[in-house]
């Protein structure tokens, strides 16, 4: 029989993937509960928040195994990876995998990364569409598309350098906002506000805020408040970045 500690370690690996890719806290706890029982536990005590998971497996013989996982990976949204993690959890609940197979499957899921072109294409289409949707012209949408490409490029290459999400978002919004304002100075025909709105929509933590409200409503108050505060600080960093860009360009040019 595989070591319960080793199994618990892999279960935490799977739940960390779920928590950092858009899963609700209640879903993370439920997954650990179900998988723990599938692997022979008679009782599962699980406590999860956005930054930590604590779980105790109690077996029929009276043995207890407890592990804690500190979540340091910034929260993101990857529904494909989340779907794969959910599918694996259902498979294990129906027919538990061996420790080796479980570890291999989790490693495969953790290595899944979206193709860069899909991120660039989606961001460009989204920024251009939102810019036109909020009243901009086709030219405004085209400018928003260009800066959406630059925004994705910045995020992709600065993410490994800057581990602080708020600072990263601030500098990205500052750079993009400055670029848009300078472009509008030389090409007065474009509408700065419409172009900015299109690119801001790529940065707003909408899913994070939605999940925070959902967590609060279903009783996960601590997790909900943590996510809500994080999303508000994130939005504040974006607002400060674009505000500084407008102030800087307006003062210099």
Set out the residue ranges of the language-model regions.
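Soluble N-terminal domains of membrane-associated systems
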Residues: 1-97
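Generic secondary-structure signature for well-ordered alpha-helical cores
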Residues: 20, 37-41, 90, 94, ...
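Alpha-helical transmembrane segments and their cytosolic membrane-interface
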Residues: 74-127, 131-140, 230-239, 250
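C-terminal ends of transmembrane helices
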Residues: 105-108, 151-162, 210-223
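Core alpha-helical transmembrane segments of integral membrane proteins
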Residues: 113-186
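Generic detector of multi-pass transmembrane helix bundles and their immediately adjacent loops
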Residues: 185-253
């Amino acid at each position: 029989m595989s070591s319960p500690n080793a199994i618990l370690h892999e279960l935490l690996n799977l739940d960390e993937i779920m928590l950092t890719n858009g899963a609700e806290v209640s879903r993370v706890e439920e997954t650990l509960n179900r998988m723990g029982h599938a692997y022979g536990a008679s009782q599962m005590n699980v406590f999860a928040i956005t930054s930590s998971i604590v779980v105790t497996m109690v077996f029929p013989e009276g043995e207890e195994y407890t592990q804690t996982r500190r979540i340091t990976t910034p929260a993101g949204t990857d529904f494909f990876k989340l779907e794969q993690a959910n599918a694996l959890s259902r498979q294990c609940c129906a027919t538990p995998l061996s420790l080796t197979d479980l570890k291999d499957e989790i490693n495969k899921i953790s290595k899944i990364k979206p193709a860069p072109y899909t991120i660039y294409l989606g961001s460009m289409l989204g920024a251009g569409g939102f810019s036109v949707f909020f009243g901009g012209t086709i030219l405004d949408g085209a400018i928003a598309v260009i800066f959406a490409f630059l925004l994705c490029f910045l995020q992709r290459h600065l993410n490994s350098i800057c581990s602080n999400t708020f600072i990263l978002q601030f500098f990205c919004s500052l750079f993009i906002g400055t670029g848009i304002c300078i472009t509008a100075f030389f090409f007065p025909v474009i509408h700065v506000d419409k172009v900015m709105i299109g690119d801001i929509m790529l940065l707003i933590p909408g899913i994070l805020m939605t999940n925070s409200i959902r967590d609060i409503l279903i009783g996960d108050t601590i997790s909900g408040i943590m996510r809500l505060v994080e999303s508000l600080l994130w939005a504040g960093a974006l607002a400060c970045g674009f505000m500084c860009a407008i102030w800087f360009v307006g003062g210099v040019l």
